[in-house]
């Protein structure tokens, strides 16, 4: 039965239809931009009102739905099929939503091609609870800095912190920035000069040395703008892409082809799967171009996070916006150096890099000359 009865005559289809109605009504009432806040308890109250149930009845109904979904998954597993159940997925989502209705979450409705309801946790220490219950833990990464912020985020008690210099030769990595461009919204969209200079920098830097290069954008929208304007065709190289929503298998195919193509170019997003999860040893990646600072796009979610961090830590913008951007940039730059023999250059196309602690970038009057000098070209 593809539409099993789960509680008091209600079927799965009834619950799905209910959720569609609630989502549609939430969009009509609260949505004014890409995503917007809905009141805490909104979803639970709507379910109670529309179904005529108490909170206990809602929970019992969802537990019954969960059991029905588990039965579907178990049957598929028995038949050696992928144990996937959309019934189970929906039940898990609704149960998780009900259980997290509290002070450290905000609740959002989103529109667009993929409308959704989202419960977003503002406090990282909630997810770190298993660590906090241990006698002691060790957290180690090249991108944890600033350590005092990491300690605050996770709510660690009486920590011992230590920061060590990189064991790799410092002369193997050069990081620089330019002063005449920025991806700040009013500059990027206030006229064509800044955008055209960004394009020219990317074209000139890719063309100045025949090295495998990654161009990291602060957003998919800016990357798509470069693509739509024909920049890949101006580079004279094979160009590969990390695109929004790309299946993992397709992304891995792109990465294999990129790594096998000497001097190829990769378009990716700072903070995406490539910049934070893949290694490029040896000559697989030698030049990284960071087009701007990956500050989070203004949104209801981001506003809520800034407000929460300001109230809890007294530094809302730094904690919610600046530090995450720096970590993303450090991750992207870190793709260049994975061993003591790797060498690489990172060029940040944004004057604001000068003010970012933890990036340690030097001013490049002419980044093309700096890159060519680093690799010994004349």
Predicted regions and their residues:
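Short, well-ordered alpha-helix to beta-strand connector turns
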Residues: 134-135, 236-237, 285
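Conserved RecA-like helicase motor-core motifs
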Residues: 158-163, 231-253
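Short, solvent-exposed amphipathic alpha-helical segments in soluble enzyme
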Residues: 152-156, 230-232, 281-285, 305-306, ...
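Conserved coupling segment at the C-terminus of the helicase ATP-binding
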Residues: 1-213, 218-233
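Short acidic, glycine/serine/threonine-rich loops at helix termini
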Residues: 149-152, 189, 227-229, 278-280, ...
């Amino acid at each position: 039965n593809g539409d099993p009865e789960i509680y008091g005559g209600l079927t799965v289809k009834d619950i799905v239809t209910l959720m569609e109605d609630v989502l549609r009504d939430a969009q009509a009432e609260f949505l004014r931009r890409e995503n917007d806040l809905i009141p805490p308890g909104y979803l639970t109250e709507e379910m109670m009102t529309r179904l005529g149930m108490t909170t206990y009845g809602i929970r019992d109904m969802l537990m019954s739905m969960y059991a029905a979904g588990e039965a579907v998954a178990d049957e598929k597993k028995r038949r050696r099929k992928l144990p996937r159940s959309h019934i189970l997925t929906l039940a898990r989502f609704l149960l998780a939503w009900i259980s997290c209705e509290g002070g450290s979450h905000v609740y959002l409705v989103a529109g667009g091609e993929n409308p959704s309801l989202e419960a977003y946790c503002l406090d990282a220490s909630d997810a770190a609870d298993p660590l906090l219950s241990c006698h002691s833990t060790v957290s180690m990464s090249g991108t944890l800095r600033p350590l005092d912020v990491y300690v605050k985020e996770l709510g660690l008690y009486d920590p011992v912190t230590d920061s060590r210099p990189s064991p790799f030769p410092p002369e193997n990595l050069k990081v620089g920035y330019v002063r005449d461009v920025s991806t700040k919204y009013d500059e990027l969209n206030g006229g064509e000069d800044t955008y055209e200079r960004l394009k020219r920098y990317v074209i000139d830097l890719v063309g100045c040395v025949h090295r495998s290069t990654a161009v990291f954008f602060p957003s998919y929208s800016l990357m798509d703008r470069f693509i739509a304007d024909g920049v890949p065709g101006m580079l004279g190289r094979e160009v590969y892409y990390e695109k929004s929503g790309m299946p993992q298998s397709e992304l891995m195919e792109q990465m294999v082809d990129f790594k096998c193509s000497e001097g190829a170019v990769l378009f990716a997003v700072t903070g995406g799967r490539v910049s934070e999860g893949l290694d490029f040893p040896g000559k697989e990646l030698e030049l990284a171009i960071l087009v701007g600072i990956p500050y989070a796009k203004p949104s209801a979610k981001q506003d809520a996070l800034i407000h929460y961090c300001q109230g809890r830590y007294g530094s809302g913008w730094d904690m919610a916006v600046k530090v995450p951007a720096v970590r993303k940039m450090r991750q992207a730059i870190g793709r260049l150096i994975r061993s003591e023999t790797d060498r690489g250059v990172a060029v940040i196309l944004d004057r604001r890099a000068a003010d970012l602690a933890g990036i340690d970038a030097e001013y490049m009057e002419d980044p093309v000359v700096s890159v060519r000098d680093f690799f010994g070209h004349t």
